[in-house]
C-alpha cells in the first residue's frame, strides 16, 4: 500500500512537471507566433526616437532645427517624434511637417512609447532655460532604461554658466548617455573641464540636409516680396554699427532694403523665401548666417556680445569664412555685399559625415 502511494505521488509529480513544461512550451510558441504575426503585419517597424528640445514656440532657429532633424532622422530610416512644451504660438510649420508631440508636463511621456531618447540641438544647455534639467539632461527619464544621447547642445554663450550643483547633476545624469556632442567648438573643453566627459563637435541640424528640402518647404509660399533686387536685413537685437551700415547701404546702393519682420504664421516660409530670393544678407543672427551659406548668398554679420560670439567663431573655423563678421567697433565694406561667398565645402562635408555617423552610432544603425 505504501509503495502504491509513493508511486502515485511520483506519478502526480512527474505529471505536474510535464504539464509545466508543456505550459512553458506553449507560452514560448505563442510568443514566437505573436512576434511572427507582428512582423508579418508590420515587417519594417521603424525605431521610435523621442527628440527632446526647447518649447514649441515662434522661433526661427528652434523650429528649423526641429524640421531639419526630423528630415535627417527619417532619411536614416527611423521614426522621429518632436517633443516639447506647447505654447500654442507659431508652430504651424513644424506641426504640418513633423510628428509633433506637444506636452504640458514631461510626466505625460512613457518609456514604452520610444526606443531611444535624444536631446536635440539649439541652446538646450543654456542655463536660463525653463525646465532646464529635463530638457538638457533628460532628468524626467532618469530611471528609463532605453538609450539616450545628446546631439549638438549649445550653451548659448562664450562661457560655462552651470553652477556646481548643476555640474554634479549633469555628471550623474549624463554618465549613462551613449554620446555627447555640442554645436560650438569652444564647448568641448568646458565639458571636459567641468563634467570630466568627452564631447565631439557636430554641425547644426539645419546644415545636415540638402537645401532642396527647404525649397520644397516653400514651394507653395505665395507672399514673395515684389522686388526683383533686394538686400535682406534680419535683426535679433539693436546694434548701432549694424543700423549705421544698413543706413549707408540704403543711401549708396540702388537696391531695396527688405527688413524682414517675422510676425505672421508663415514666418518660417517668409524667412526661407526671403533669403533664397535676395541678393545679399545683413544680419546678427546665427541662423541668418547659416541660411546665407545654405543658399550661397553674400552676407555681412554683426557680432552681439550679449548673445556670445562662440557660434560665429565656430562658423569661421569650420566653414572657412573669415572676413564677414564684425564687432561693434568695425565697419564693413559695401563691396562684401557683392563679393561671391567662398567657403570650404570639403571641410563642411567632412563634419557633415562625422555628424551623420554620430547619429547612426547612437541610433545603433551602423
List where the protein language model places each region.
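Active-site anion-handling motifs in enzyme catalytic cores
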Residues: 2-366
Amino acid at each position: 500500500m505504501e509503495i502504491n502511494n509513493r508511486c502515485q505521488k511520483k506519478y502526480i509529480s512527474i505529471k505536474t512537471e510535464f504539464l509545466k513544461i508543456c505550459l512553458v512550451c506553449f507560452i514560448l510558441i505563442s510568443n514566437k507566433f505573436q512576434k511572427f504575426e507582428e512582423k508579418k503585419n508590420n515587417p519594417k517597424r521603424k525605431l521610435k526616437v523621442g527628440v527632446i528640445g526647447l518649447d514649441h514656440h515662434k522661433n526661427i532657429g528652434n523650429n528649423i532645427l526641429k524640421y531639419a532633424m526630423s528630415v535627417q532622422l527619417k532619411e536614416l530610416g527611423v521614426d522621429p517624434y518632436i517633443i516639447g512644451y506647447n505654447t500654442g504660438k507659431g508652430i504651424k510649420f513644424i506641426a504640418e511637417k513633423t510628428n509633433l508631440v506637444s506636452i504640458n508636463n514631461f510626466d505625460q511621456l512613457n518609456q514604452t512609447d520610444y526606443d531611444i531618447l535624444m536631446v536635440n540641438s539649439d541652446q538646450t544647455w543654456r542655463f536660463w532655460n525653463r525646465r532646464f534639467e529635463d530638457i538638457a539632461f533628460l532628468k524626467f527619464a532618469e530611471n528609463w532604461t532605453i538609450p539616450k544621447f545628446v546631439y549638438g547642445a549649445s550653451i548659448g554663450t562664450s562661457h560655462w554658466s552651470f553652477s556646481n550643483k548643476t555640474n554634479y547633476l549633469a555628471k550623474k545624469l549624463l554618465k549613462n548617455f551613449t554620446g555627447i556632442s555640442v554645436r560650438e567648438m569652444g564647448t568641448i573643453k568646458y565639458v571636459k573641464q567641468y563634467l570630466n566627459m568627452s564631447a565631439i563637435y557636430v554641425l547644426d541640424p539645419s546644415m545636415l540636409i540638402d537645401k532642396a528640402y527647404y525649397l520644397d518647404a516653400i514651394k507653395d509660399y505665395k507672399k514673395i516680396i515684389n522686388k526683383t533686387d533686394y538686400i535682406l536685413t534680419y535683426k535679433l537685437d539693436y546694434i548701432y554699427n549694424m543700423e549705421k551700415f544698413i543706413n549707408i547701404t540704403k543711401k549708396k546702393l540702388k537696391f531695396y532694403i527688405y527688413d524682414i519682420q517675422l510676425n505672421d504664421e508663415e514666418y518660417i516660409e517668409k524667412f526661407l523665401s526671403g533669403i533664397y530670393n535676395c541678393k545679399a544678407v545683413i544680419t546678427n543672427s546665427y541662423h541668418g548666417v547659416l541660411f546665407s551659406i545654405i543658399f550661397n548668398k553674400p552676407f555681412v554679420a554683426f557680432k552681439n556680445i550679449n548673445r556670445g560670439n562662440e557660434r560665429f567663431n565656430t562658423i569661421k573655423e569650420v566653414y572657412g569664412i573669415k572676413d564677414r563678421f564684425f564687432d561693434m567697433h568695425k565697419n564693413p565694406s559695401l563691396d562684401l555685399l557683392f563679393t561671391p561667398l567662398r567657403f570650404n565645402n570639403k571641410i563642411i562635408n567632412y563634419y557633415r559625415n562625422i555628424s551623420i555617423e554620430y547619429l547612426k552610432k547612437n541610433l545603433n544603425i551602423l
